[in-house]
């Protein structure tokens, strides 16, 4: 499930300095997730991944999100949910990059995207994964019940993503734009 995204990223033969920048953004997302461990579902990971994709490329967002999911779970616990989280974080970044990368980004549409993508894309994906992993006989009724039980958690995660986007939008995007222009990275 990750192969097309990784192949597309690797196909452009990234420079070492680009990989260092993505590793830094991944470390920032992991540190943010660890710093807010005490607040359930209030994590800056998706906001950082979205801003990475917006500042650079959709593939950069996917790689940052997938790596952040894998690495942060060394602190939070690996399990059968890890690939699903990696895919969810990565897709939130990739789609954000497709929608916003390479153009002037307005705050309100970005906040709406952050909220909706985390609630619909990440939330439904992880709810579906939970149903598939923990039930021997999946059904549509079971899927609806699983999604319904996750609504509050997904709303909190989506709302916190919008808040983190609001707080990080200007400072992080301006710094990333400066780095991109100065070093000609991820164009």
Report the location of each language-model feature.
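Membrane-embedded alpha-helical hairpins and interfacial helices in multi-pass inner-membrane proteins
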Residues: 38, 82-83, 98-187
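Generic transmembrane alpha-helix motif of multi-pass integral membrane proteins
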Residues: 4, 45-61, 95-100
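Hydrophobic alpha-helical transmembrane segments
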Residues: 19-24, 47-48, 62-66, 83-87, ...
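Membrane-helix interface "capping/anchor" motifs
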Residues: 11-16, 54-64, 103-106
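Interfacial aromatic-anchored transmembrane helix boundaries in multi-pass membrane proteins
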Residues: 31-46, 66-100
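Hydrophobic transmembrane alpha-helices
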Residues: 1-50
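Small-residue-rich segments of transmembrane alpha-helices in multi-pass membrane proteins
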Residues: 22-31, 51-56, 116-125
């Amino acid at each position: 499930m990750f192969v097309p995204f990784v192949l597309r990223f690797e196909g452009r033969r990234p420079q070492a300095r680009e990989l260092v920048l993505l590793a830094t953004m991944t470390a920032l997302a992991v540190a943010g997730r660890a710093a807010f461990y005490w607040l359930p579902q209030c994590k800056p990971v998706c906001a950082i991944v979205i801003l990475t994709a917006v500042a650079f490329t959709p593939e950069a967002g996917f790689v940052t999100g997938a790596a952040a999911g894998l690495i942060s779970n060394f602190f939070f616990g690996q399990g059968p949910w890890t690939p699903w989280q990696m895919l969810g974080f990565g897709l939130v970044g990739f789609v954000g990059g497709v929608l916003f990368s390479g153009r002037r980004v307005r705050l309100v549409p970005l906040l709406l995207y952050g909220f909706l993508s985390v609630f619909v894309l990440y939330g439904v994906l992880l709810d579906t994964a939970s149903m598939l992993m923990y039930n021997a006989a999946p059904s549509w009724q079971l899927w609806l019940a699983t999604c319904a039980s996750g609504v509050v958690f997904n709303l909190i995660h989506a709302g916190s993503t919008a808040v983190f986007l609001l707080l990080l939008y200007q400072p992080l995007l301006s710094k990333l734009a400066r780095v991109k222009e100065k070093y000609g990275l991820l164009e």
